[in-house]
Amino acid sequence: MAKKEKKQVPLEASLWAACNKLRGSVAATDYVNVVLGLLFLRFAYDKFQVQREKLLKNEDTKIFVDNPKFYSRDNVFYLGEKERWPYINAHSKQNDIYQVIDTAYTNMEKNNPALKGALPIGYYADLHIEPSKFSSLLDEINKMQYSLTQTDDVIGRVYEYFLRKFCIAAKSEKGEFYTPGNIVDLMTRIIQPYQGSVYDPCCGSGGMFVQSAKFVDAHQGNRKEITIYGQENSPKSYRLARMNLAIRGLSCDLGEENADSFLHDLHPKLLADYILANPPFNLKAWRTEKQLTEDDRWKG
């Protein structure tokens, strides 16, 4: 009798199962932060390696193989030896894995100014996860097989799956919502942001911007003709948004820090061509009686 072919488990389900082994150390609501921070390291390395091989193949450029400028010009992050995925993965079962990850993030920010303040330095060490449990998650990410053209889809799939799995689409205490991908897709189709400035005052992890870029790609447009502006109050979501956009090669201005767009507008002079947002409609007591009375945005 022929053996039954083993059904392949989808990537996002495998990652979720690996995260479940971290229970007790990590709240399920934080799974997505844990995973996407590691996916960023894997994707950054894969893109770096492709660019590195491209430079080495050309006699005129191979002398610049360790010059960060020859990576950043193509929206690729330059990685030193200790920031590369094989080095990180080689330490996956060692007690210094969290220090290795922090060193990688620190060096990446140092070598790539666009990442300054965006990476979760110290995050994994603060979780105090037992290294043996953490290594199983790294193993799942290491086994991933995908093409670089699928990077956007992999990130999106994992993010949506994790949020849907834990019902974050429902109302939360902080008034935050996850906007389903089909809704974001409909919004971009309606406004058709072929070029100009796109603004989201409560951008979360940057999903509106990603979909805008996908819309441009689908219509054979040029991503460089759209300018991204945004703001996010949650520190974790702010970092996720910057990583999310950076790994896709999308330049953006999300302000120098996370901030509440109601009370601290980081783009006071911006006149955007398009505004895409899913505001926290159920947020209560978001200002005092005297706050914002002189704010130009609320006059008229």
In which residue ranges do the predicted regions lie?
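Non-catalytic, mostly N-terminal accessory regions of nucleic-acid modification and defense proteins
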Residues: 1-194, 253-266
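Intrinsic disorder/low-complexity signal
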Residues: 11, 294-295
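Conserved S-adenosyl-L-methionine
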Residues: 173-277, 282-292, 298
